[in-house]
């Protein structure tokens, strides 16, 4: 089996790329970072530090790399069996034209073997969104062939991979936590279902997408935003602050009540899942910066993302949301010189005030009770 993975960054190398290579799949990375490409093609291997209670160093070998903006990547798409991505939500649209060109070449060369594409991004139904971008880049005459031969498979991914702080300055070295979860929608594949250790197949993906979004992502973001306000540098420092931990745990319990109501998750098992995530945030081997986790607050405050979507669920079912509201208020306070979205958020609040700004960003009714609650919490934490 041959696979092409877009995104040779830390998540690409430390998570999805590692799983594919470990499964014996012939793997090629595609990226724009020439330093990383050159290193991969010189060595064809790299080291992954898996940290937790039992620390280990794994070597991933037998890998190659191509530029994601050259002709080589188009040629590869014509012949591989699987394409995966870990490029970040905003970059999916940028890689779509190359994928479209590769699919056209695949069709022209008469390669009718099924191809499956899986976007492994921190977003809901990311592959479906990628499919939309790819279809927009195709001529009408090619779309039916793509629909017939190419599976666009949505997935939920979960592994904390902080930026590398390698003392060796090795551009390929990466550190990851022990925990990982890659759940894919088996109803969307073309051809036979793949057997890849570490890939879990389900016919109820949205339950797992929302479980991860409402728990890991919600908790991670609120920990970062409250931690930044309190002057903590890392997620571990923040979650060990009892006042922050109480709000984060409370928010995950509030979002969890939505999941239990919506999907029938077992309450005791979900409580254990929350505890596991709190333990992951405490991992002393992961130096995860609150500023990194908090970046892009406009996206994280949008209607379909980790703060507002669970809040909407509590409104739908008439459930408590006091801690989620505290997290939203903390997100509105997020400031970072390194993050354009943080600067845009600050400008919007200055221009329109917190009530109108939150309504514009989140899609919530400016005159609703819940926006008033969030504004009160925002003003109380100035």
Swiss-Prot record:
One of its GO terms (biological process) is mannitol catabolic process. Belongs to the mannitol dehydrogenase family. Keywords: NAD, Oxidoreductase. It comes from the Bacteria. PROSITE patterns: MANNITOL_DHGENASE. It catalyses: D-mannitol 1-phosphate + NAD(+) = beta-D-fructose 6-phosphate + NADH + H(+). This is Mannitol-1-phosphate 5-dehydrogenase. Transmembrane segments: none annotated. NCBIfam families: PRK02318.1-2 (NF002646), PRK02318.1-3 (NF002647), PRK02318.1-4 (NF002648), PRK02318.2-2 (NF002650), PRK02318.2-5 (NF002652). NAD(+) binds at residues 3-14. One of its GO terms (molecular function) is mannitol-1-phosphate 5-dehydrogenase activity. Its EC number is 1.1.1.17. It is an enzyme of class 1 (oxidoreductase). One of its GO terms (cellular component) is cytosol.
